[in-house]
């Protein structure tokens, strides 16, 4: 599987170049802005193209070396796309609400994940000994935990890289990653704060088409990294009785085919 490809035209069609009204800008973003049109800042796509390309290579290389990528996007416009993209490539996501300490207090988060697993086992087994109210209360607990932790319950440890949509809204996630030395890829709109973002991608972080494009490209880069990891391991997949998890992810992605055109190589 080749690295995901993209063109300047795709970025333009997705509205990646549209920033916010000039009164909402962050002066720290000045180096990434091309100009102003109708009181709206225009992002310099001549910079976006190489910076997005670099970010995708970082994703691929991280995964090729066995690393984990955490997709973060909790605002309504991003939530579904973040979850779908992460699931498509076998990675992890937070799309409901960032809980304080999700990275810096991983031990406590691990305890909550363990509780979620216990509830899953309880509800999938015999609940005959429980009252209807008890089952309802446990189910509600599970739903609450699943919303917050469902995307990371299989992560098994801290991520090696964060991919963030809306660095202003996900400020806490970026601060925690910075404290732990975890690199961050972040989409930076004209009102964004670039502090703590290791690999910036200047671009609109509100338009659904733009968000979908970023997510599809990052997901494609992960899949390319998985392919590289499998190739480097020298596994004879055809001779194996059971397929590695990574291969299952690649097969599922291949089955989707043209459903994610932005991820196509």
Curated annotation (Swiss-Prot):
GO biological process: translation
Name recorded for this polypeptide: Small ribosomal subunit protein uS2
Species, as recorded: Gluconobacter oxydans (strain 621H)
Gene3D superfamilies, alphabetized: Glucose-6-phosphate isomerase like protein, domain 1, Helix hairpin bin
Membrane spanning residue stretches: none
GO molecular function: structural constituent of ribosome
InterPro entries with a match to the protein in the record: Ribosomal_uS2, Ribosomal_uS2_bac/mit/plastid, Ribosomal_uS2_CS, Ribosomal_uS2_flav_dom_sf
HAMAP family membership: Ribosomal_uS2_B
GO CC, alphabetical: cytosolic small ribosomal subunit
Alphabetical list of PROSITE patterns matching this protein: RIBOSOMAL_S2_1, RIBOSOMAL_S2_2
Entry similarity comment: Belongs to the universal ribosomal protein uS2 family.
Keyword Ribosomal protein among record annotations: yes
Keyword entries, A-Z: Ribonucleoprotein, Ribosomal protein
PANTHER family (alphabetical): 30S RIBOSOMAL PROTEIN S2 PROKARYOTIC AND ORGANELLAR, SMALL RIBOSOMAL SUBUNIT PROTEIN US2M
């Amino acid at each position: 599987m080749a690295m995901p490809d993209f063109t300047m035209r795709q970025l333009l069609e997705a509205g990646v170049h549209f920033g916010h009204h000039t009164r909402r800008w962050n002066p720290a973003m000045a180096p990434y802005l091309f100009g102003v049109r109708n009181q709206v800042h225009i992002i310099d796509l001549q910079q976006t193209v190489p910076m997005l390309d670099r970010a995708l290579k970082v994703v691929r290389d991280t995964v090729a070396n066995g690393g984990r990528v955490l997709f973060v996007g909790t605002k309504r416009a991003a939530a579904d796309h973040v979850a779908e993209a992460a699931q498509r490539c076998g990675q992890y996501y937070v799309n409901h609400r960032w809980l304080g300490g999700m990275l810096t207090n991983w031990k406590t988060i691990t305890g909550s994940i363990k509780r979620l697993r216990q509830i899953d086992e309880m509800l999938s087994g015999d609940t005959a000994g429980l009252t209807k109210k008890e089952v309802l209360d446990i189910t509600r607990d599970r739903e609450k935990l699943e919303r917050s932790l469902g995307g990371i319950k299989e992560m098994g440890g801290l991520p090696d890289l964060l991919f963030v949509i809306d660095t202003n809204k996900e400020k806490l996630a970026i601060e925690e990653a910075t404290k732990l030395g975890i690199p961050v890829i972040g989409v930076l709109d004209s009102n964004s704060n670039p502090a703590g973002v290791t690999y910036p991608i200047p671009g609109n972080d509100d338009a659904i088409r733009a968000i979908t494009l970023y997510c599809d490209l990052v997901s494609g880069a992960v899949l390319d990294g998985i392919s590289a990891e499998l190739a480097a391991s020298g596994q004879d997949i055809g001779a194996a009785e059971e397929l590695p998890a990574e291969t299952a992810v690649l097969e599922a992605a291949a089955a989707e085919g043209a459903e994610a055109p932005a991820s196509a190589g």
